Amino acid sequence: MQIHIVGAGPAGLLFALLIKRRFPAWRVHIFEQNPPDATFGFGVVFSLNALAFLERDVADFHALLIPRLESWPMQRIVHRDEQVEIDGNGFSAIGRLELNQFLQELCAAAGVEIEYHRVIASIDEVSDCDLLVGADGGNSFIRRALEAEFETELELLTNRFAWYGTRQTFECLSLTFRTNADGSFVAHHYRHSPSMSTFVVECDEVTWRHAGLDRMSEDGSRGYCERVFAPDLKGNPLLSNKSIWRQFPLVWTRRWSVRNVILIGDALRTVHFSIGSGTRLAFEDAIALDRAFAETGDDVARALDVFERERRPVVEKILAAANASSYWYERLPEKMKLQPCELAYDYMKRSGRMTDERLRELSPKFMARVDMERAAKTRGES
């Protein structure tokens, strides 16, 4: 059995590791266009305890990963210079490069072949195999090569965002809302190592154009964002790594496989960064695809059917929540008219899945503050 995987990110690496361990005689070859130490975006974030499933399926990777995570038990919203803490809404984070390097080492030890610096110009270059896995991210070459057959759908969100790093470390994952004469901004920021943080700046299109960010250089944009978030960066600069302004692409494929070609991770569907589930879903895809082959052996067609049957309901549920979250940010100027606690409450309800009852169980201190401020507002209006 010959397996070709395009893309050496979390999805491709973990699937390669699992399938090679399960079937050592199978040849598993990864094609990656970048060098092994390339990474973009600085850190990745997971909801707290979201990776417990790894302990069962790839215990050595789990053992390497968990002690290196930066973790915190709450989230913080900063609006109008007022902090609102949301207890119980914890997250963990790690640097993207560190995460990939762990997986690269495990893959090499298992006998997976990884070919770096390999730019693929035609799908024919990698199609001579029993199974071709497209794990090459949101701009997947494999998906685009078979776009009509995968029945790909694409929606570009209107907000702009740029992904930075900074040596300013933060206590927890935070959303910081700022305004200036040009409009409204929000930063998603969290530490992903003891000395580094990820800092994603987002704004609506009107603000982006009014600020002249559509015409600025990368350095000019970085300097502008440093000024907007100066109170939060405390003198530390933002660090660029291809930190250009982008629009988030909501990608979905109606078909998950075409003949012996399957997509996993962001190549299959993109998940907005505001819910912190993209890498977790990539891992879960890899595990589910490996399990499908455990059930079917080398029957590729049947394995792909089993994979889709197991994963599609789960993915569709999470994707609905992620899309609802992304649309919440698309109304950023409107949301910033809310008072700080009102904004935090509205944020927690943005996916449509969170009830007040569940929120009281998850975040009792936060909801006590919500109730107190509501009562004070009612007294003031009476």
Where on the chain are the PLM-derived regions?
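Extreme N-terminal starter segment of soluble prokaryotic enzymes
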Residues: 1-3
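Conserved N-terminal helical subregion
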Residues: 48-163, 365-381
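Conserved mid-domain beta->alpha element of the FAD-binding
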Residues: 5-21, 133-134, 244-328
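Conserved N-terminal glycine-rich FAD pyrophosphate-binding loop of Rossmann-like flavoproteins
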Residues: 35-53
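Glycine-rich FAD pyrophosphate-binding loop
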Residues: 18-41
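C-terminal helical "tail/cap" subdomain of flavin- and related membrane-associated enzymes
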Residues: 21, 291-382
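Conserved FAD/dinucleotide-binding core of flavoprotein oxidoreductases
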Residues: 89, 95, 171-250
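Conserved Rossmann-like nucleotide-cofactor binding loop
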Residues: 11, 15, 36, 139
